[in-house]
């Protein structure tokens, strides 16, 4: 694929593999009984809508239906007028999620084409974490109810959980959980980790997650899956976790580098509920963080308490203890990614009430995030600057391609058609 060195947002949108996606839509019967809102039209309309606003809604998506400028941009035939938000809601409920998952997979391959082998080696750290989004408007049909005290008189607000495996450039696996049982990270994170391990075409990946995963059984499943593909994981345990130590793993105890003090580095096993050692052998690294960290203030004015000591668990027996501690530090990158999605790509605004629709919106959000990261990399810009410039370029393109609403014809504006500049 011929990718410009410094592409505009319009050039990136024209790189979308529309022919291949149309073939997949036909083969997967995505457009069964759909005359107007086909999968391709929904894909293109939602892509532009995500780039245009930070507060996405079904009505906003429907308002772009009659924008014939977008019809020319994507080579689609669109009719004039609006599409009702109820029609969009119905399509979000019924369209197969696999079409949008496949679309994200194909579009993320564009990013792989501009990634060098050295950069790919740096992307072998896969951060896995979850982020909660609250349903403020009461749209969700199903959701988790968390954090509300009984007897306050306030109705329970439902929440949903986004869980993703992010390698720094693309999301290897993602899912949305609405069942209350998935409030525990012991269920959500292992499920996404195993999906990422099974779907990734790469080897030697290192999966990073926090201490929400503590189940001996789940850690064992992750250990077996990662070893099978020559991958590994680095997690975190509670400091009070009982460990059956079988031997010393390293010689770096007592070393301090970049504010990290290695206290102990041992081989051992976790104990099961019955008190017996588990069959899986791990490496346990206890570290102390010497750098003073200023905790962020919470709403109630209390300081958040950080542990000075951290207990890491891993099945990586070759890297040094300091290297593994450095890997775990990079887990924070996914928190920055979640923040970007919430602030710039409407992650916190729920535009569908069904789980099917929420998953479609999730993959659409990731598609646009991939385009933003490609634009950001090729134009040497930060994420906020990149998405700001992409929005301006898209609006400028629409302005330079006005539409004769009376006849429904495209009228491409030239420089001579623009109003003269004022001398004042």
Protein language model regions, located:
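Single, function-defining residue in the core of a domain
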Residues: 1-58, 64, 120-122, 138-139, ...
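DNA-recognition alpha helix
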Residues: 56-77
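Short helix C-cap/helix-to-loop transition motifs enriched in small/turn-promoting residues
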Residues: 71, 97-99, 282-287
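Active-site-proximal, Lys/Arg-enriched surface segment
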Residues: 87-167
């Amino acid at each position: 694929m011929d990718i410009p060195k410094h592409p505009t947002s319009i050039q990136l949108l024209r790189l979308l593999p529309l022919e291949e996606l149309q073939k997949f839509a036909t083969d997967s019967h995505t457009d069964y009984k759909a005359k107007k809102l086909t999968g391709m039209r929904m894909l293109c309309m939602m892509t532009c809508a995500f780039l245009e606003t930070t507060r996405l809604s079904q009505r906003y998506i429907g308002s772009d239906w009659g924008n014939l400028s977008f019809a020319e941009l994507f080579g689609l035939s669109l009719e004039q007028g609006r599409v009702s938000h109820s029609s969009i809601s119905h399509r979000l409920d019924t369209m197969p999620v696999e079409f949008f998952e496949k679309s994200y997979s194909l579009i993320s391959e564009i990013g792989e084409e501009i990634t060098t082998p050295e950069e790919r080696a740096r992307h072998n750290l896969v951060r896995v974490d979850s982020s909660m989004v609250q349903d403020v408007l009461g749209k969700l049909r199903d959701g988790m109810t968390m954090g509300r005290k009984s007897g306050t008189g306030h109705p329970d607000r439902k929440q949903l959980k986004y869980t993703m495996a992010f390698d720094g450039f693309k999301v290897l696996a993602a899912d949305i959980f609405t069942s209350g049982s998935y409030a525990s990270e012991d269920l959500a994170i292992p499920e996404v980790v195993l999906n990422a391990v099974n779907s990734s075409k790469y080897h030697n990946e290192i999966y990073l997650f926090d201490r929400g995963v503590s189940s001996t059984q789940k850690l064992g499943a992750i250990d077996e899956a990662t070893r099978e593909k020559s991958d590994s994981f680095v997690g975190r345990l509670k400091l009070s976790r009982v460990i059956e130590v079988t031997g010393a793993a390293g010689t770096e105890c007592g070393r301090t580098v970049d504010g990290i003090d290695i206290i102990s580095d041992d081989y051992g096993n976790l104990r099961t509920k019955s008190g017996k050692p588990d069959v899986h052998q791990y490496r346990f690294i206890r570290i102390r963080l010497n750098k003073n960290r200023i905790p962020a203030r919470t709403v109630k004015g209390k300081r958040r308490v950080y542990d000075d000591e951290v207990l890491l668990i891993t099945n990586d027996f070759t890297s040094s203890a300091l290297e593994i501690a450095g890997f775990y530090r990079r887990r924070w990158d996914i928190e920055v990614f979640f923040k970007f999605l919430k602030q710039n790509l409407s992650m916190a605004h729920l535009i569908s009430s069904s789980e099917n629709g929420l998953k479609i919106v999730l993959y659409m959000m990731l598609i646009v995030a991939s385009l933003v990261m490609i634009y950001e990399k090729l134009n040497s810009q930060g994420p906020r600057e990149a998405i700001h410039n992409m929005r301006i370029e898209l609006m400028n393109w629409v302005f330079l391609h006005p539409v004769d609403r009376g006849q429904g014809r495209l009228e491409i504006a030239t420089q001579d058609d623009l109003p003269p500049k004022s001398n004042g």
